Structures are given as structure tokens and as C-alpha cells.
């Protein structure tokens, strides 16, 4: 609700409001890759500190409570935006999605007949070296405007593609940005040993989650 009011000029803050945000945060992270996976990615020190440096340029070292996130601030979080997109490429909320064919579809030598149900393996597409250079390397800069090409337009689908894509994708991106910006401004995330992307075993269920628990150390930043 705050986001909608802000967008229409009736509210300028996207505050850290427990009454509005907390239920949504838990729900969103269950769908957006799982909190453990997101925190693991945040433990990649070089990438995390790039995000933090960008946030320092916007807010300085004051606490999120003293300098709350405003809607217009989100437009300046360019690296964070790429960081989130790369996380969703490697760990899409929904690793698979079903579709009902309304017409025959030719795939190579085969024809999928109208009326059948198909499954689109989003995770496999996102990690396919045919479409992505070094697909198992976490590289937010692959989403720089000058690098975006056919892979982004045709093979990047964390919210799926076409007229039946996720209607809440813009809201989800805003919410994830606010949550991650708040977490990164407040805490430092570390792991004893850097985990490689291909070492994270995943459950291919309705939503993506890790098979094994992922331990992440959390330290509070010294802020004023």
C-alpha cells in the first residue's frame, strides 16, 4: 500500500513499517529464491561491498531508521538492481512453470500438439551456457545496458515471459530492493568458506530452496 501511495505522489517514504512490510517480507523471500540462498549470495564480499558502496553514496552511514528508503532512491540503486537480477537468474523463485498449448508447436524434428501440458525448465534455461557466458559465475554486470542482448530478452524469465507473466513483478522488484538495501545497510553477511554456485544443491519444487542448510554469519554494521 505504501508503495502504491508513493508512486501516485501521496506518500514519499517506503519506510521500515513492521505492520506493512514484515508479512510481505517473509512471503516474498519464500518465493524469491529462499532467504538462505539470498544471504549466501550476499556473503560474496566483493559484490556485497559494491552494493554497500552504492548505498553509501545515497544515504551515507546513517541508519535505515534515520534515513528511510524513498521511492525515488530506488532509481539510483543500479548495481543493486543488477545484483538482484543475477541472483534471480541463478536462483529463480519458480524453477519450473507449466503451460497449456493452444496450438501446435514445432521444436526441431518434433511437434508438440495443441492441448498438451508442457513444463518450461526456467532454472535450466537460466544456467545454459548456450545462452549465457560462464553461466555459473555470479556476475551482476552481465545486466549492464550495453551487455544486455538476446539472452536477456528471450532466455531470462524469473517472472516468466509473454502476456501471462507475473503481474506482480514490478512490486516484487521494489520490495526485494527495499529489503536487501535495508539488510545490507544494517548488517554484514559472511561465510567461513566461500560457496561456489554449483555446490549449492537445490530442491526443484514449486519454489526453489536449498537441500542443505546454509550457515551465514551476520554482523551488525557500526552506524550512527
Residue ranges and their predicted role:
Residues 74, 120-147:
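Conserved cytochrome P450 K-helix/beta-meander segment immediately N-terminal to the heme-binding cysteine loop
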Residues 45-48, 171-207:
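Cytochrome P450 heme-binding "Cys pocket" and the immediately downstream C-terminal segment
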Residues 1-33, 66, 72, 77, ...:
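Conserved cytochrome P450 catalytic core segment spanning the I/J/K helices
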Residues 9, 117, 188, 207-224:
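C-terminal helix/juxtamembrane-tail motif
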Residues 3-57, 87, 116-121, 149, ...:
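Central I-helix of cytochrome P450 enzymes
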Residues 62, 66-108, 129, 212:
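Conserved cytochrome P450 K-helix E-x-x-R motif and the immediately C-terminal K′/meander segment
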